[in-house]
Amino acid sequence: MNPHFRLLCLSLGLGAFIGTSVAWGAFAQLDRPDATAGYLARLLINEVPFPGERGYESEANSQAAMLEILWVLHARIHLIPNGYRQTQVAGVQSKDIIDVITGAGGRRQCEGFFRDASGRFVTAPRVQERIDNLLSIANGGSKPGRFAAMLNYAQGLAQAYVKEGMPGADRYAGLKQVGPVTVTGHAYSWMTDLDAFHPGGNFVTIPDTDDGSLGGNRFFTLRKVPK
């Protein structure tokens, strides 16, 4: 999964889903980190670049990556293809999105997101430090800008998912062929978009021609017929 981005320096309709939250300031706020929607929002934020960070292209590109990451998590629970077991795809057997994020038995699915010795879902200190920094920037001006929009978009996605399920279309749902390889459609993994990173096994890289690179991440689908 994506390493921690180093900071260099949505106000969409989804805002309607934002309920009881921990407010940082006037423009951007996140739900509590011990709430499912707050924890999920922090993952979406952590996995994409913000302005001034490596891999950042645009607000829309990073937001698209957030949505596809959410689709990966959803697919690992609800869209396991024929011929695969959930444990092969997600590393866990669970209907709980928190389990899919944190992994089980010491195996972490998303770097910096895990359960502590008491079983509480927590983040690594560096994750919270970056999020605090992003919130500070978002709420530090005289009016909301890109940082606030991106933070609120992530929280809106998370709240919408927890309350009503997937809030947007999966751009990879109809993908059937990658080169000579027949694939399942949907993405089931994402990693930092570097050639050296690949989840291996039956995962197939989604190419640029199918928008496989979003928000500094490369997305992967699965072979239709497992090896």
Stretches found by the model and what they are:
Residues 10-19:
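Bacterial N-terminal signal peptides
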Residues 1-9:
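Bacterial N-terminal signal peptides that target proteins for export
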Residues 1, 14-15, 60, 80:
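Intrinsic structural disorder
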Residues 27-227:
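Bacterial extracytoplasmic/cell-wall-associated proteins, especially those involved in peptidoglycan
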Residues 20-26:
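Sec/Tat signal peptide C-region and signal peptidase I cleavage site
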